[in-house]
Amino acid sequence: MPTADGKFGVGIVGTGWCAAAHLRAFAGNPYTRVVLMCGRNEQRARRKLKDFGAEVADVSFTRKYDDLLSAKDVDIIAISTPNHLHAEQAIQAAQAGKHFVLEKPTGLDVRELAKIGTAVRRAQVRTIVSFVLHYNPFLKFAYWLRESGRLGAIRYVRCQYLSRILESYPGWSWLKTARSGRSHLLAAGCHAVDALRWCSGLEPTAVSAYHTQFTKGYQWPTSIVVNLQLGRRAIGQVVSSTDYMMPYTFGVELMGDRATLRDDTIFWKDQPIDLDELRQANPFPEVTLKPGRALDGSSMIQIDCEMPASGNVRSHPFQGEIDELVNCIRQNRESHLNVFDAQKTMEVCLAADRSATNNGRTVKLPLIKQTGD
């Protein structure tokens, strides 16, 4: 039930930097107002959220998640707690009739994924999962470029999530554990799996993976390489690691039978891409296209826009995510990033971890044979 001012009431569970990002995004939406937050210690929670840039002076506080579930003025719940709590809290939110935004990973095993899907399907609530890079200008352009047919039929895709995460990372105390962090794909690299699926438009049908560990302090392998079969002919690869001595890197490569997108560059061989035509067709004013030269002197197109260049959530496009969820609620329609789509990404991650644990044995997908959306 909307609040007295006609806005959707929002409840937040979790008090870390993702919760702060959700708070800022809901504050930036004209149809929502955060009314209640849930955490373990009120003074500490308010201080942390303020330090992360969120204004919470007018937001009530509770230590009980049940209070969010039963509150009549809470229509939407934002779940940004440690990973092992996500599934149960999402299921409870759906059963209480609350729409929700859920941080990744949605679930840590097949059973959790299936239970989330069942609860949401029965409740018919609207959901969105925080694969926020869908709202990054570069990834939006990459998706559009492939969808427009300018790359041709996709033959190979590679996405990389490389981020050096150590003790200074917010949430380190639980992220490093096998119970909550679980694996690098589930804790972080699922963003790369999601990007591979979304940007390529292809669904993995089988995976084979290997993992290893170099960085101390983690209770799980810190690097994994995943090889994927994409339909009948295309292949792909995901690399997810916290071991490399380099800045945060989120790489996207889409290689088609006409042209190739490799991060911020478009290449071709036989069929040149007309830069003027591409500029006119480009639907994103924040994306600029420039002529360039490859190392061999051949022509290429340079993409100039905000790239996914930081693991700090303050720079991530949460506003687009929250705006989409609210629009879906207002218009009674599904989000393209609902829990059913996210389930497919999480199944790839679980299959890859299963393969790596079994010395690269191929695992077929999907893991859950019947899904509904």
Show the residue positions of the predicted features.
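Beta-loop-alpha module in the N-terminal Rossmann-like domain of NAD(P)-dependent dehydrogenases
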Residues: D58-A119, P317
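Hydrophobic residues in well-ordered beta-strands that form the structural core
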Residues: I79, L102-E103, T127-V129, V238, ...
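Rossmann-fold dehydrogenase core element
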Residues: K115-L133, G152-R158
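Predominantly a Rossmann-like dinucleotide-binding segment in NAD(P)-dependent oxidoreductases
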Residues: L133-Y218, I224-V225, N359
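C-terminal capping/lid region of NAD(P)-dependent oxidoreductase domains
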Residues: G152-Y156, R354-D373
